[in-house]
Amino acid sequence: MDVSNLPSLVTRLKSMVVAGLLLACAAGAQAAGCPALLDRSMPRLQDEKPQTLCQYSGKVVVVVNTASYCGFTSQYKGLEALYARYQDRGLVVLGFPSNDFGSQEPGSNQEIASFCTSTFGVKFPMFTKTRVSTSAGADVNPLYAELRKATGSAPRWNFHKYVIARDGTTVESYSALTAPDDNAFIERIEKLLAMP
């Protein structure tokens, strides 16, 4: 065995170990920056491609289950206005169509996407049709299962809202009766946006 190459071999091995450690630290830092509640991917409504919710870390997140044929469907307009008004300050609205209540979301993902954009000009992120009700059992969307666990409150109808604070752990629940333009709701959103 030629030992003259040993120092260069050791140097290369050290470089590879250091590079591996740096990559592992970077991956760990990324995962550490994402709260457990948002550490998941969901398929987008428009193309069904997975989208990580970690990208919303550090934002105030309004999660709402939606339906196209509900008495509360007009809340899309208020949700879009809320999103447009506060997105530059760190708010995002995430819509999750569901057919769980009154079968008021019977369409396909493409039909729902078309309805949302053509009827209400929805630009906030929307995800594929999902199950949000406690009656869904094991089929309930895992994000909704965690939101229910965090608040002790499950959606009882379409347009139930959860608000996740920037810390990713503080969660509040609002029934469908709370409109997106409700003064108390807006005040709470503004307080959460003002918090680090």
Which residues does each PLM region occupy?
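Thiol-/selenol-based redox modules, centered on thioredoxin-like
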Residues: 142-196
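Bacterial N-terminal signal peptides that target proteins for export
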Residues: 2-17
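Amphipathic alpha-helical repeat scaffolds
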Residues: 65-69
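Bacterial N-terminal signal peptides
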Residues: 14-26
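Loop/turn elements at helix/coil->beta-strand transitions in domains of secreted/extracellular proteins
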Residues: 57-61, 87-92, 120-125, 158, ...
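N-terminal "domain-start" segment that seeds a small globular fold
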Residues: 30-54, 74
